[in-house]
């Protein structure tokens, strides 16, 4: 069941039946399976429920292009759960929602997207290496270039 559906309930039951130390190896295999699971959002939800924040952060960073920012009910708690120890992953979750909102013209979500952009700004000083995603300043400049005419959004950005 676990491998097909990423059921944390089934995995916990399975791990309880294993001898000491075998459970750690099985848990590592489960995390590896989650990292490669076809549905990145199901994998992220599993890793957050477990909880395995380091694995969730790794998933977000390695599969950032697959994230659907429309899934705010997943991305918001992911960003919250990861912000303290994994600010890069939290930033990527927030950016996925900002990008979706602006690219889709979801003006009803502008308030949230502006707040998310502010959260990204607050996380930025805690990120040592932005890798290939661009700094907060670079990201904000790119947003202005692509979505500068969305005054409803920019009027909410502080």
Indicate where each model-derived feature is located.
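Eukaryote-biased, non-catalytic alpha-solenoid scaffold regions
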Residues: 1-158
């Amino acid at each position: 069941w676990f491998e097909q559906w990423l059921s944390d309930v089934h995995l916990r039951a399975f791990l309880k039946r294993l001898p000491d130390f075998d459970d750690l190896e099985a848990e590592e295999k489960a995390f590896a399976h989650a990292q490669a699971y076809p549905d990145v959002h199901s994998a992220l939800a599993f890793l957050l429920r477990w909880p395995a924040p380091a694995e969730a952060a790794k998933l977000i960073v390695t599969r950032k292009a697959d994230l659907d920012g429309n899934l705010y009910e997943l991305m918001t708690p992911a960003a919250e759960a990861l912000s303290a120890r994994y600010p890069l992953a939290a930033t990527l979750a927030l950016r996925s929602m900002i990008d979706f909102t602006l690219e889709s013209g979801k003006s009803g979500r502008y308030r949230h997207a502006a707040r998310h952009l502010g959260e990204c700004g607050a996380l930025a000083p805690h990120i040592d290496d932005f890798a290939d995603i661009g700094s907060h300043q670079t990201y904000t400049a790119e947003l202005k270039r692509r979505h500068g005419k969305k005054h409803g959004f920019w009027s909410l950005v502080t």
